[in-house]
């Protein structure tokens, strides 16, 4: 009788196990180093290659000012010399002393001892940087970008996709609290006044117009402060935001008029048409909740508006630093303009408490790469949930923004949002005065041990109750469909008669907004 030999369990030899373990470790190491940089950005505790401190510091090097409105052709640059810094420091100390007599005076600088200074114009900023894989256009020359936005460059669908590239760039480390605070201070620096000193150089050709006496720091216009790190060859462009009485953005109100016009144009549904009592900032309103889309687009692109002005300032910075990495930042309106500029030219942009800028981005036809994943965006919006302007809740006829003449009707942001939950963490109530930049710096950015986590915005729709038509003529010449019945027996038939109304334009409206007078 045959007996089967007992089965034997096979054991791997030590050499075999060692080979498997070695291969596993090598695969893990290879996977780690092959991991895209944008997936490793969240390691805020790492101070290695993923998060590097800049070898040099950022110092204010120049200031740009650009006229808007009637003075939109004026564009100048001031080199920040030791004489300018000294005079600015004296003015800052004088202004600070005078401000101590007023309890509600907005401070010009942070009260935190870590960032204390007697002269904000002489402050040296330290920023940490990080690598970022960013999808942006291969050709970013301003002339090409402008022709692309204005529809002057024809491309096939294949060419459209081919012009986008995945670019390895250097960006500010938005997970580092100190870097976020420094960028916010750079944004607040654009609010600080500078004395009437130094030589302003014309960026454009000499003008035929006579420069108005009040132009510059005491007149209309937009400003950009340029900070430069000579060691790393990195530029930070800080754009001045809203300065207005009633709407707390800064401590002074030099450009209130044009700031309000541009705020209402950028962030309202249709030319700040909140009710019949409002004076609109453009003539694109057709009738109740109907707006001329092409008219809005033309208004935003006008050369005397802020978007064109900030693009011109960027051109000047690019000419001054052609090989440098350029980052943009700003607060409020300045933050929204920084985001629009970053979207236009593929620049890293960090905005603070900015209104929703998705709507103006679309109206300006700014480049949005097809199928862009959120982690490849280079735009970050920092804010807190007690600021109704940032959260998009400061709207309606009875809102605090409306009471001071602002139609802040947008809520949707592009890029990523980094929100501090001060309502639950600190017990704050929603208040327009929480929008102030130094309240944000002192009590929010410095009030938390870590920077807010940046996430993809939730699904959002602006102006859902408005109808936007291609043009005013399209509304007046639309085909009216009417149905009439034929009573011929034994069946009833229905036929459709199409009639076309003649093209006309409304030239007069009553107080309810209805058209009372037409012009052919």
UniProtKB/Swiss-Prot annotation:
Its EC number is 3.1.1.3. The active site is at residue 332. Keywords: Autophagy, Endosome, Glycoprotein, Hydrolase, Lipid degradation, Lipid metabolism, Membrane, Signal-anchor, Transmembrane, Transmembrane helix. The keyword Lipid metabolism applies. Residues 1-14 are cytoplasmic. Residues 36-520 are lumenal. It is found in: Endosome, Multivesicular body membrane; Prevacuolar compartment membrane. One of its GO terms (cellular component) is vacuolar lumen. It is a single-pass type II membrane protein. Pfam families: Lipase_3. Belongs to the AB hydrolase superfamily. Lipase family. Present with 3060 molecules/cell in log phase SD medium. Lipase which is essential for lysis of subvacuolar cytoplasm to vacuole targeted bodies and intravacuolar autophagic bodies. Involved in the lysis of intravacuolar multivesicular body (MVB) vesicles. The intravacuolar membrane disintegration by ATG15 is critical to life span extension. This is Putative lipase ATG15.
């Amino acid at each position: 009788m045959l007996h089967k030999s007992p089965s034997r369990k096979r054991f791997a030899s030590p050499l075999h196990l060692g080979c498997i373990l070695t291969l596993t470790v090598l695969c893990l190491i290879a996977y780690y180093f092959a991991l895209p940089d944008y997936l490793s950005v969240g390691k805020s505790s790492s101070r290695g290659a993923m998060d590097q401190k800049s070898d040099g510091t950022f110092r204010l090097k120049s200031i740009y000012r650009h006229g808007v409105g009637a003075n939109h052709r004026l564009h100048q640059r001031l080199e920040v010399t030791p004489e300018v810094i000294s005079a600015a420091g004296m003015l800052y100390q004088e202004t600070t002393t005078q401000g101590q007599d007023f309890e509600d005076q907005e401070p010009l600088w942070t009260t935190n001892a870590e960032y204390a200074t007697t002269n904000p114009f002489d402050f040296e900023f330290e920023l940490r940087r990080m690598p970022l894989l960013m999808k942006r256009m291969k050709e970013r020359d301003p002339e090409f970008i402008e022709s692309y936005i204005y529809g002057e460059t024809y491309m096939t669908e294949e060419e459209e996709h081919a012009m986008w590239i995945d670019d390895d760039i250097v960006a500010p480390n938005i997970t580092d609290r100190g870097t976020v605070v420094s960028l916010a201070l750079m944004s607040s620096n654009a609010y600080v006044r500078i004395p009437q000193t130094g030589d302003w150089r014309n960026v454009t050709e000499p003008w035929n117009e006579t420069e108005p006496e009040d132009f510059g720091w005491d007149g209309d216009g937009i400003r950009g402060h340029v900070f430069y790190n000579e060691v790393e060859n990195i530029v930070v462009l800080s754009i001045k935001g809203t300065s207005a009485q009633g709407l707390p953005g800064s401590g002074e109100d030099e450009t209130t008029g044009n700031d309000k016009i541009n705020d209402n144009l950028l962030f309202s549904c249709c030319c700040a048409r909140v009710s019949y009592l409002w004076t609109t900032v453009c003539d694109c309103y057709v009738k109740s909740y109907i707006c001329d889309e092409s008219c809005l687009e033309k208004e935003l692109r006008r050369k005397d508006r802020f978007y064109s002005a900030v693009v011109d300032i960027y051109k000047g910075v690019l000419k001054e630093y052609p090989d440098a990495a350029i980052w943009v930042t700003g607060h409020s309106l300045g933050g929204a303009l920084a985001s629009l500029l970053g979207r236009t030219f593929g620049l890293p942009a960090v905005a603070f408490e900015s209104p929703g800028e998705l709507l103006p981005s679309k109206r300006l036809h700014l480049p949005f790469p097809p199928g862009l994943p959120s982690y490849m965006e280079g735009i970050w919006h920092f804010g807190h949930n007690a600021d109704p302007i940032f959260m998009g809740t400061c709207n309606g006829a009875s809102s605090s923004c409306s009471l001071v003449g602002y139609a802040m009707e947008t809520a949707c942001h592009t890029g990523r949002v980094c929100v501090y939950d001060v309502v639950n963490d600190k017990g704050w109530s929603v208040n327009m005065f929480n929008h102030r930049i130094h309240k944000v710096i002192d009590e929010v950015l410095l009030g938390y041990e870590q920077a807010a986590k940046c996430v993809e915005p939730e699904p959002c729709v602006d102006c859902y109750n408005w109808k936007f038509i291609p043009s005013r003529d399209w509304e007046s010449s639309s085909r009216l469909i009417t149905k009439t019945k034929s009573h011929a027996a034994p069946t009833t038939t229905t036929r459709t008669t199409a009639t076309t109304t003649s093209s006309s334009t409304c030239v007069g409206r009553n107080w309810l907004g209805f058209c009372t007078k037409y012009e052919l």
